[in-house]
């Protein structure tokens, strides 16, 4: 074997354009953190579901890529997007169709084996699958119509609202939560009936925020895995028996997205699509609503928030200035925020790595402020 040939080929690669090294570091880091939490906190069982979901997710994703190619489920890149994204056209999409069900199956199996199965898990499973199906319809229309536009915004919001209302009715009828919102320390604010419309807004906002974040290779899957891990650790630290099943749900979701990340990092071999991103956001919101971790989710999900707010600012300022002075003004080069940095000339992998690092910092902050 000509080792010199392979060594020279490796040296010639631009590692800044390959997200594998940092993805492996992220996976190892989350595994190490899970080991530490399991060692120092009684009843913590994060490592087994994490490792299991990473391995199974990676295997299923590799198999799924082949299946998605066979049925021609490939990404369509919008013409008005960054020019560097045209090379992503044709990449298999709808990867979330494998990851979400697998993570839910594993979560419920772990819950049954540990005698922690609960109605909360049923509600979360319903919410995740329902939002996955909405994303699936959206992705399928986009793929079959050969354009980066599936369901209309109105149709998507209506479907998300219907599912959100069903979820909220379910948790209300089963008395699975209260209307208090925990903020700093043990301070709470009771919202009473106002909690329910706010909860519905959070479901829609979070699912669409993760959807907006899914615009760079490995960005949403990495950030999502970090936030799920943070929520799992916070729930374990609380020491409430009712939260252990949800903590298992969170760490299994984290593992599933980490397994997916192996193939979703730059250069991506598969995208999660709306099928995955909507389910991810809905799951995060559902966990926060059921476990009173809304404040923590707001802090941990700072990147999701920033991406969403950047779009609101961009559209709002553009429409307002166009109405007042006849010419629309853009605050950012392009929204969501990650596209702004792309057009500034920052490499995709650098943007993703920095957004991951910011998420890690804010996850640590949220846990310390609990």
Curated annotation (Swiss-Prot):
Cofactor(s) listed: Mg(2+)
Keywords on record: Cell cycle, Cell division, Cell inner membrane, Cell membrane, Cell shape, Cell wall biogenesis/degradation, Magnesium, Membrane, Metal-binding, Peptidoglycan synthesis, Transferase, Transmembrane, Transmembrane helix
Entries under InterPro entries matching the protein: Glycosyl_transferase_4, PNAcMuramoyl-5peptid_Trfase, PNAcMuramoyl-5peptid_Trfase_CS
Enzyme class: transferase
Gene, per the UniProt record: mraY
Topology in the lipid bilayer: Multi-pass membrane protein
Species, as recorded: Prochlorococcus marinus (strain SARG / CCMP1375 / SS120)
Keyword Cell wall biogenesis/degradation: yes
Catalytic reactions of this protein: UDP-N-acetyl-alpha-D-muramoyl-L-alanyl-gamma-D-glutamyl-meso-2,6-diaminopimeloyl-D-alanyl-D-alanine + di-trans,octa-cis-undecaprenyl phosphate = di-trans,octa-cis-undecaprenyl diphospho-N-acetyl-alpha-D-muramoyl-L-alanyl-D-glutamyl-meso-2,6-diaminopimeloyl-D-alanyl-D-alanine + UMP
Location(s) in or outside the cell: Cell inner membrane
Pathway participation: Cell wall biogenesis; peptidoglycan biosynthesis
Name of the molecule in the record: Phospho-N-acetylmuramoyl-pentapeptide-transferase
